[in-house]
Amino acid sequence: MSLFNKVLASVGVGAATVDTKLHKSSYTINEMVTGVVEIVGGNTEQQIDAIYLTLYSNFIREIDDKKVNDQAALQSIKINEPFTIQANEKREIPFSMDLPSIVPVTTGHSRVWIHTGLDIKNAIDPSDKDFLDIQPTRLASAVLSAVQNLGFRLRKVDTEQAPSYLRNRTKIVQEFEFQTTNNTYRRYLDELEIVFLEQSERSVEILIQVDRRARGLGGFLSEAFNMDESFIRLTIFENDNIQAKLADAIESKMR
């Protein structure tokens, strides 16, 4: 091929392209994502140094008391050794990637995607972006249903930057915020937030934030200094009476 074609390829004109093809688009947390990365050569041969797949999620973080949208790389893998793609050559490389338990469910404004990038020396690197539909595990779904059966309504779901005490475990957390509809709970609680810390087929570890309703002058002072929030760390197993276990934990913070 001519030098002219190589120069054009270096600035992205007539260069190699990449397209990631997933075997399916919907996945459950802890499932393995599989597919192939298809590379098609351009008008001239090019050296492909590396192909990277990176799992991303959007999230919200606070900067100077303002909420801004950001994105977090949750996992990245390299799927090849260096090779040369010839002009107009088509090559497929299979891959598999485990979904970590911290990946958020794609509900509300939460989005998850795989970014594919080719590392081509002295050239503009082509890339591809594929969105995933992430569903909760069976046990996580059972936990959320049990909370609603206790008398709470799911108000919103946000993916946010992990608080400082959790950042050694994860960059982001997905918060399920519930508002009480039960008269008994309404007397004591403002809201309930649940974060899934670890998930497997047989167990889930959750963090429950209980926001107690202010009662009297002492209660208002507690709210003023953010002392009205209590935390419960709880592991729920598949054979547990989930609703009863959650009720016991929540009610322990109402006494």
Language-model regions, residue ranges each:
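Terminal, compositionally biased non-globular sequences in eukaryotic proteins
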Residues: 1-255
